Design a protein with these regions (language model features):
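Non-transmembrane "mature" sequence context
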Residues: 1-119
Length: 119
């Protein structure tokens, strides 16, 4: 099977799951942390996430967070990790801890969107 055929066979559920796992790797988040953020069991993350489900919407927010942060720091991984792991007076906490709740994830994504001028 060539690469084109392989991509055609990926369902939206699998694409979202794979994107979330890739973001997790880029941000040094474990599968356990990702699963906790999106409200799924770690063992089910690789089986796909329905985009229109609550976990799917949360996964999309995590991906949006990554994309916004990537743009803001010019794609520098060390700066992305520093931002995530450092106390932030504007978000009133440490973003990596804040994104463990739905409210915190939403607040952090909204903050990043505002910083990018996407309000």
């Amino acid at each position: 099977m060539n690469v084109t055929q392989q991509h055609k066979e990926l369902s939206p559920d699998m694409v979202l799951s794979k994107a979330l796992l890739n973001v997790g790797k880029a941000l040094n988040l474990t599968q356990v942390e990702l699963a906790s953020i999106v409200g799924k069991d770690r063992s089910t993350l690789k089986k796909g996430i329905k985009p229109d489900s609550v976990p799917g919407q949360l996964a999309s927010l995590v991906i949006r967070l990554y994309r916004a942060l990537y743009v803001l720091v010019g794609g520098k991984k060390i700066d992305m990790l520093h931002w995530l792991q450092t106390e932030n007076v504007h978000t009133r906490g440490v973003p990596v801890d804040q994104i463990q709740t739905v409210t915190g994830l939403n607040d952090v994504v909204n903050y990043l969107d505002a910083m990018r001028g996407k309000t």
